[in-house]
């Protein structure tokens, strides 16, 4: 069984997970690819195709055609797209090879800009290139420079697509070369592991990682770890020594953490809430937070599409296109909410229709309540950059924003069912169990983004597009309604002046 580049990269994250991926694909993919995961694959393919236009005139190799690749390499074909190389132990496909007159330069295309995670991504990309380089050398391919091609974070479209500026080309040769010996040893170890007939005994390396960083098959590999474990403690992944001490001490359930074990205040609150099944309320800060919210109160939620390849002037790679909002307005204490909504389904830029609709919908005064304020405020700031004539309005909106998530990230309220999370998808069922996303056709933001994209690109038949638009309205509408009902639940906690047992 040959080791692919993809399985090698999975191995580097978690060896056990790589074994499961190869030998138990039904476990590795117990759930079908989410719409979000499918969209990521689609974006990657789109960026690959676009990047080939920077290196025009190449030959596209059929999937898995190592024999055809070898023949074209022997003929010194100038440019190859998706060439495939195999040895007796390894297999890989490259994005682009370009003959420079003496050797083949390798170009790996990534649908990313680097961004805040640039250092971690660059290490991953260097190992990616190292694997390819070693397999190509194993095939006797004369190899020149190793390049990374990715989207230019600084590029802003003027309405056309300048491929020379849309992509950056970075020479990674000096990063990759020092890694080659170590990567060769890792490749051997990974190859030998996937030959094993049985899964190595637990635990996997992810036992020492916070929940969000664990492998996709952690529960299968580590059946002795409870569903709600110390890996769910807030920010425990940033304290690896603390997590290791708990795991090595055999303390896995959140409720088993000793009273004398050193935890941060938020972590201790989480443990106590889980252990006693009680709602923790920091009354004074919660009362102050709620008192600062002014009527009329507008609960506002945006939906956006992060377009990798800019479609409109003023946009750069992965800039968010705002296409929808939902708003529930309460004008006075005890008043019935007024629902206002907007959804743009045209193929042109939605910026001005979005802003105009927001102007009509939003009250002239009062608080604007959102969940995760940096997101909505960031969208408004970008709109102001692209539409400077609307800056005064958008800046005023941002100045009135109140972040309801602060109640939960600041642990003014801790419920055992939050499990250390602050997402509205965790908070809503705990505080307002009568409301749920589960019955909706769209249940999270990534699906909403992809659905809108399919509507505006004509990927859906008219009837399906109309139904999809209704599904978008229902989803976004529940987001703003959820904030309203969570706010009401918080008001009820303060009015009750007691800490209740969790259900």
Predicted regions and their residues:
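Flexible loop/turn segments at secondary-structure boundaries
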Residues: 114-116, 155-156, 224, 254, ...
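Metal-dependent nuclease catalytic cores that hydrolyze phosphodiester bonds in DNA/RNA
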Residues: 1-103, 243-269, 274-276
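Small-residue hinge/turn detector
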Residues: 237-240
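Acidic, Mg2+-coordinating catalytic module of metal-dependent nucleases/exonucleases
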Residues: 154, 159-230, 249, 427-502
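Conserved RNase H-like, two-metal-ion catalytic cores of nucleic-acid enzymes
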Residues: 51, 85, 106, 285-364, ...
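Long, highly charged low-complexity segments
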Residues: 251-309
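Conserved DEDDh/DEDDy metal-dependent 3′-5′ exonuclease domain
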Residues: 70, 77-83, 87, 91-95, ...
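Short beta-strand-loop-alpha-helix junction that forms the active-site gateway
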Residues: 109-120
């Amino acid at each position: 069984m040959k080791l692919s580049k993809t399985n090698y990269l999975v191995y580097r994250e978690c060896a056990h997970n790589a074994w499961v991926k190869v030998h138990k694909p039904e476990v590795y993919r117990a759930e079908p690819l989410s719409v979000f995961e499918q969209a990521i694959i689609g974006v990657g393919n789109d960026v690959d195709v676009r990047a080939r236009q920077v290196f025009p005139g190449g030959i596209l190799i059929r999937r898995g055609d190592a024999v055809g690749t070898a023949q074209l390499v022997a003929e010194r074909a100038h440019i190859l797209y998706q060439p495939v190389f195999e040895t007796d132990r390894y297999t890989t496909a490259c994005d682009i090879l370009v003959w420079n007159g003496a050797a083949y330069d390798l170009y790996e295309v990534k649908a990313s800009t680097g961004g805040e995670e640039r250092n971690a991504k660059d290490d991953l990309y260097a190992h990616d290139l190292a694997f390819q380089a070693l397999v190509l050398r194993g095939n006797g391919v004369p190899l020149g420079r190793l390049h990374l091609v990715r989207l230019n974070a600084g590029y802003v479209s003027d309405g056309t697509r300048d491929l020379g500026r849309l992509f950056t080309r970075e020479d990674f040769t000096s990063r990759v070369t020092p890694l080659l010996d170590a990567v060769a040893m890792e490749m051997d170890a990974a190859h030998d592991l996937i030959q094993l007939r049985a899964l190595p005994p637990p635990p996997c390396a992810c036992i020492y990682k916070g929940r969000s960083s664990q492998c996709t098959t952690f529960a299968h590999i580590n059946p002795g770890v409870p569903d709600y474990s110390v890996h769910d403690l807030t920010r425990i992944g940033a304290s690896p020594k603390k997590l290791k001490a708990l795991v090595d001490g055999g303390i896995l359930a959140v409720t088993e953490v000793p009273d004398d074990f050193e935890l941060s205040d938020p972590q201790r609150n989480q443990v106590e809430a889980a252990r006693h099944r009680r709602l923790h309320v920091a009354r004074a800060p919660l009362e102050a937070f709620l008192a600062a919210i002014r009527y009329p109160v507008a609960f506002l939620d945006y939906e956006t599409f992060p377009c990798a390849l800019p479609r409109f002037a003023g946009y750069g790679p992965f800039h968010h296109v705002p296409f929808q909002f939902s708003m529930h307005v309460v004008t006075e204490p005890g008043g019935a909410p007024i629902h206002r909504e907007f959804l743009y389904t045209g193929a042109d830029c939605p910026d001005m229709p979005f802003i105009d609709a927001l102007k009509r919908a939003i009250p002239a005064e009062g608080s604007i309540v959102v969940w995760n304020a940096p997101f909505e405020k960031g969208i408004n700031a970008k709109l102001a950059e692209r539409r400077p004539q609307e800056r005064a309005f958008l800046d005023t909106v941002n100045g009135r924003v109140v972040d309801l998530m602060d109640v939960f990230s600041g642990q003014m309220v801790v419920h055992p069912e939050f499990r250390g999370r602050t997402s509205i998808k965790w908070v809503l069922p705990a505080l307002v169990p009568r409301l749920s996303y589960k019955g909706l056709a769209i249940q999270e933001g990534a699906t909403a983004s992809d659905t809108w994209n399919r509507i505006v690109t004509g990927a859906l038949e008219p009837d399906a597009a109309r139904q999809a638009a209704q599904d978008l309205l229902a989803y976004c509408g529940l987001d703003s309604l959820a904030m309203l009902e969570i706010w009401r639940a918080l008001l009820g906690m303060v009015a009750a002046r007691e800490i209740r047992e969790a259900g």
